[in-house]
């Protein structure tokens, strides 16, 4: 078996490509089922955020497994393989393991050290288990990566003062407008990113804010979190009736098709109205053709890079400190991974010893007579199990702990010879 990740991110693909490959949460179950149906994919997990789409697999045949994932991505995005491949990255085993740990720690994010990605990795793990994509190996990998992400945040100061996508969007608005306090602002969506946008807008002095959402109840729940502010609530269905009231719009909904395009906006905008739209959704909530309207300025997540760059240099030293912690977690995972090679031999030895124990116990109980056997069977059973477990404990621990591959294999061969164990050809391949 081997671990691989196939994906793309803000580093390899622009937003117009990333949005085509985005897998919404309600599409995860079907996507995981489709990937698991391929003959060379044993386990799968899908990490889909506004800045990345990454598919982690355990595969019995690395080249074939990667080809199956690439084919899936082409079908999902309706992009030809030739176009898609130029944006993809592929990492194998230790590189794939370290990549997920760096992602969970926020070191691979557009905003170094941002905290939201760790909760997204946790959600990927939870849903991967729920939809039967994650098995023994990816379960261990994601747990180790989540531990790594937590350690980086608690043992370094990389997360202190880190900007997020939402705060960078507000920062961009502040750079582009004379005074946020004078702006009439609309926030489309009521999810976590929208909550952070509202939070940062209020911190920057904005005081004329409306929340528009399909569910006004959810919009009201969001507004209630900022009870000190007078936030207006509208249904998203009212958008084109009220849009002329606003100078600045933030969009962050989970809609899979654009909410705003030129044909919808042009008829409702007033002649002298200037409008700025900052779209932090992926897929984008704002169609590219809105840029054709002279009085409208549109920015998307890729336009935040310049804002974020100002925050990054001070974090690079912290990132180096974090990398050392990740190396420790990588080693811990690698020790576990390599110990999988010993599982068939250990299982065979346990099965053989257990068979002998049961046979000898049965003989002993029959000699002791039925009355004694019935009275003391549980005690004798526990005694023999305890003896067997204690005898096997040290050899098994030592075998698993052997990090040198050849030493470990020689030890397994010795056990197989000494105990006349079957040689198992299905030993897990732990080649890096």
Curated annotation (Swiss-Prot):
Residues in the signal sequence: none
Binding-site residues for NADP(+), renumbered to this chain: 189-194
The keyword NADP belongs to this UniProt entry's keyword annotation: yes
PANTHER family: GLUTAMYL-TRNA REDUCTASE 1, CHLOROPLASTIC
Important for activity, annotated site positions: 99
Additional observations: During catalysis, the active site Cys acts as a nucleophile attacking the alpha-carbonyl group of tRNA-bound glutamate with the formation of a thioester intermediate between enzyme and glutamate, and the concomitant release of tRNA(Glu). The thioester intermediate is finally reduced by direct hydride transfer from NADPH, to form the product GSA.
Record key words, sorted: Chlorophyll biosynthesis, NADP, Oxidoreductase, Porphyrin biosynthesis
Catalytic activity: (S)-4-amino-5-oxopentanoate + tRNA(Glu) + NADP(+) = L-glutamyl-tRNA(Glu) + NADPH + H(+)
Entry keyword NADP: yes
Any Gene Ontology biological process: chlorophyll biosynthetic process
Enzyme Commission number(s) of this protein: 1.2.1.70
GO molecular function ontology, one term from the record: NADP binding
Catalytic residues identified in the record: 50
Free-text note on domains in this protein's UniProt record: Possesses an unusual extended V-shaped dimeric structure with each monomer consisting of three distinct domains arranged along a curved 'spinal' alpha-helix. The N-terminal catalytic domain specifically recognizes the glutamate moiety of the substrate. The second domain is the NADPH-binding domain, and the third C-terminal domain is responsible for dimerization.
InterPro entries: 4pyrrol_synth_GluRdtase, 4pyrrol_synth_GluRdtase_dimer, 4pyrrol_synth_GluRdtase_N, GluRdtase_CS, GluRdtase_dimer_dom_sf, GluRdtase_N_sf, NAD(P)-bd_dom_sf, Shikm_DH/Glu-tRNA_Rdtase
Recorded family membership: Belongs to the glutamyl-tRNA reductase family.
Pfam families: GlutR_dimer, GlutR_N, Shikimate_DH
Pathway: Porphyrin-containing compound metabolism; protoporphyrin-IX biosynthesis; 5-aminolevulinate from L-glutamyl-tRNA(Glu): step 1/2; Porphyrin-containing compound metabolism; chlorophyll biosynthesis
Protein name from the UniProt record: Glutamyl-tRNA reductase
Residues where substrate binds: 49-52, 109, 114-116, 120
């Amino acid at each position: 078996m081997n671990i691989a990740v196939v994906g793309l991110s803000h580093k390899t693909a622009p937003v117009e490509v990333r949005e085509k490959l985005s897998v919404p949460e309600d599409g995860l179950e079907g996507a995981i089922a489709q990937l698991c149906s391929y003959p060379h994919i044993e386990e799968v997990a899908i990490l889909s955020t506004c800045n990345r789409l990454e598919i982690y697999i355990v595969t019995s045949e690395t080249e074939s497994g990667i080809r199956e994932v690439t084919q899936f991505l082409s079908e999902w995005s309706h992009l030809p393989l030739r176009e898609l491949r130029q944006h993809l990255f592929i990492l194998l085993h230790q590189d794939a393991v370290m990549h997920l740990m760096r992602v969970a720690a926020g070191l691979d994010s557009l905003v170094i050290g941002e905290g939201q990605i760790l909760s997204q990795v946790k959600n990927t793990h939870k849903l991967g288990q729920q939809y039967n994509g994650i098995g023994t190996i990816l379960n261990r990998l994601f747990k180790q990566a989540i531990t790594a992400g937590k350690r980086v945040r608690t043992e370094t100061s990389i997360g202190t003062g880190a900007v997020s996508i939402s705060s960078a969007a507000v920062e961009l608005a502040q750079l582009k407008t004379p005074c946020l306090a004078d702006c009439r602002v609309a926030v489309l969506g009521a999810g976590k990113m929208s909550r952070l946008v509202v939070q940062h807008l209020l911190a920057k002095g904005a005081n004329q804010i409306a929340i528009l959402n399909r569910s006004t109840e959810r919009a009201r729940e969001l507004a209630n979190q900022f009870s000190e502010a007078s936030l207006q609530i509208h249904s998203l269905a009212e958008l084109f009736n009220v849009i002329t009231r606003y100078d600045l719009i933030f969009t962050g909904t989970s809609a899979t098709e654009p909410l705003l395009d030129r044909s919808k906006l042009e008829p409702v905008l007033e002649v002298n109205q200037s409008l700025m739209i900052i779209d932090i959704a992926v897929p984008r909530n704002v169609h590219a053709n809105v840029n054709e309207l002279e009085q409208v300025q549109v920015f998307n997540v890729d336009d935040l890079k310049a804002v974020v760059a100002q925050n990054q240099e001070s974090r690079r030293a912290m990132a180096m400190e974090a990398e050392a912690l990740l190396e420790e977690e990588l080693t811990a995972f690698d020790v576990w991974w390599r110990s999988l090679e010993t599982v068939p031999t250990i299982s065979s030895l346990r099965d053989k010893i257990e068979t002998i124990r049961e046979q000898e116990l049965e003989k002993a109980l029959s000699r002791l007579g039925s009355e004694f056997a019935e009275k003391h069977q549980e005690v004798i059973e526990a005694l023999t199990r305890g003896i067997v477990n204690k005898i096997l404990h040290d050899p098994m621990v030592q075998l698993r702990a052997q990090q040198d591959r050849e030493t470990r294999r020689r030890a397994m061969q010795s056990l197989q010879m000494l105990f006349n164990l079957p040689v198992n050809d299905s030993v897990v391949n732990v080649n890096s």
